[in-house]
Every structure is written in C-alpha cells, then in structure tokens.
Amino acid sequence: MKKAIYFFLILMLTASIQVGAQSLDGTWKGVLSVGSQKLTLILHVSEAERSAKLDVMEQGAKGLPLTVNVMENDSLNVAMTQIGLHYAGRLRNGVIEGTFSQNSFTTQLIFNKGEVVQKRPQEPKPPFPYRVENIQFENQSAKGTLSGTLTYPEGYKEGQKVSVVLMVTGSGPQNRDEELMGHKPFLVLADRLARHGIASLRYDDRGVGQSTGDFSSATTAALATDALAGIKYLRGLKKFSCVGILGHSEGGSIAYMLGAGGNADFIVSLAGPACKFDTLMMLQLNGLSKVQGAKEDVVHSVAETRQLLLSKDNSLWMKSALDMNFSKFLPLIKCPVMALSGSNDLNVPAEFNMLSLQNGLPHNSKNVIKIYPGLNHLFQHSPTGNPLDDVNIDETMSEEVMNDVCTWINKVTNNNH
C-alpha cells in the first residue's frame, strides 16, 4: 500500500513539474475564421526579450510587431493598436486558448505549438548545373545600387553568345526572387530558363535586401529607371546576343514602358497591366470582394474607385499609378511581345487587359497573346483565383507557362537549344 501511495505521489510530482515547465516561448500556429475566409496566423513569442511578432500567411505579412501587455506564467495579452487588433490567451495543456478581436469583430482563437511547413516542390535546390553570380549595377539617375543574381545557362562556356532576360518584380517591395506568399517565382523561373539555355538577371527592388535606395518614394516610372539600368548593365557586359525584359504584374507594365523606348530586344509580360490603371483597379476591387463573399460591387465608377483607394493609400506611388494609362506605350513597341494571363487572375482581369493588348500592339508575327485557363495572378492553378489561397498552393508557377516562355524566347532569339 505504501508503495502504491509513493508511486502515486511520484506521478503527481512529475505532472506538476511538466505543467510548471510549460512555456509561451516559441512559434505558434492558429487558424482565424473570418466569414468564409480562413487566415493562418503565426505567433512568434520570446519570453527572454518579452516580445511577440505576428505573421499572416495568406497576406504575405511577416514579423508584424505586437505590443506585449501581459506575458507572465501561462498568460499572454498582445495588441496591435494601430489596426485595433487584440489577443488575450492562456496556455493550457500545450495550447494557447484565447479571444481574438479586431475593432468590432471578436472570435475564439487557439494557437498550437509548431511551424507551418510549406511544400514547394518546384523550388530548386543546390548544387545547380549552371553558374550563378551575385552582381551589382548602378542607377546613376537615382544614385542607387541594385544587387542581383546573374544566372548563366546550363553548359555555358565563356565567350558563348546567349540570350538574357532582365526580371522585374510586381508591385510592392520585393526581393530578387519576387518572394511572396511563401513562393519564389523568379527563383523557380530563373532555374527553368537556365535549363533551357537562357541567362537571366533578377535583382532586389531598391531599398530591399542588398539594394540601396528608398522604395517608399518610388513611382512606377522611377522603378522603370532601375530596370533600364539593369538592361544597360547587361548590354555593357557584351556577353549576350539578345537582351530582353521579363516582368510580372507591375514589372510587366515596366516591360511595355521600356519596350516603347526601344530598350529591349523582346518582352515577356506576365499579367502586366496594359490599360488604364484606375479602370483596372475598379475591376480588381469588385472581383476580389466578390470572391471573398461580397454580393454586390464595392465601387461603381472610376471616380469612386480613385476616392476609395486614395483614402486608404495616399502614397506618391498610388497617386501616380492611378493616372497611368499603359496602353499608350503599346503602339510604340517594335520588338516581339509575349503577353500572358490566367483566366482566374483577379488582380489583372485577363479579358479586359488582353483586349487592350490586341488593340494596341502593332502587328508582329512573333507576338503571342495568351490566356491560360484556371490560372491565377501568380500563374498557379487556382479554382477561384482568390489571392488568400496562394500560400496554400504547392505549385509556384505553371509548368506549361514556364515551358512556353522558354520555347518562345529561344524561337524569337534564334537560340538553338
């Protein structure tokens, strides 16, 4: 009997030690339900630094600093006052149970310990069968240095003339891999190009990564000068037979701008706006709101669209972008153009944008204008095109799109690969 009591006391003591050893420290994962949408929240807690940060996976937000009100024993109370966000929870049995609120919205939210493991099967891993160089080039007009990665084709030999593409990212500050939603589209695409005999240069946006400069004050026109500096750098190397530009989203519009100035030997535009930007934004706002549950249009005119956007973002970039009409550059382009879109692209609606291209581009038998069924703005297969789903899609970019891009570039540049 005494042995039984003694054994029971040992169990109780062990349990109490385990409970007492529970710690808020580490990475926690929770799923927030907002209507029909689900957001994956990652909470990073450091008891030693008494700090907490938040990632919102579907929105590509990382390291958002939280104000710590309480971090003691099993209790956690954090907030982000500027957006009215608040979370109060308690650690029980290895999970944090609590209440999430933002302004008038309140719901229960549970965090489980652990990282989010994302599958990215297309992402290349070293060692690579091609040469890669970290380089820098100067934008003299902006007094900035852009840092990037120059990737040579598989089997490249010094003195061999090959085609090269300058890769230009979409809107917002992005690194050379155009990293967003846990994907690295430009890394994946650069790898595919190299394996098809095509060199590429991708670079960090100004003020991002290893590039200098101030992104916050940059307009699309200013960012185009960065891309132009990249083209001049590539031509100055005297290693390449043809220098083209490949841009995604805003980068695709920059490709049209530089093509109109005769700066590129060929253009690949991946969902690049080729129309009036304010009209495009009206279609975008209504399309995105409907896929996320709205039953009616949120804006009914271009004027209303401009007013709504400027009330939320009064930056120099937004002001200038709303006045841009990218269709004016199209008639001036003399080089071959490959313009691609996905039918489920809600950011740059394909039918509307492609109509502008068909009407604006001069006839060129080498031009390709194509809409891929079922692809979203990132050229992933997506049933709805909802950007909130991007992070949960394993595919980074459609195999068909990447192969078509490589085949077309080799064809228009007479690169026999």
Task: Describe the function of each predicted region.
Residues 22-91, 97-103, 122, 129-130, ...:
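Central antiparallel beta-sheet cores of small beta-barrel/beta-sandwich binding domains
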Residues 229-286:
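Primarily recognizes the serine-hydrolase "nucleophile elbow" in alpha/beta-hydrolase
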Residues 262-332, 347:
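Accessory cap/linker subdomain of secreted extracellular hydrolases
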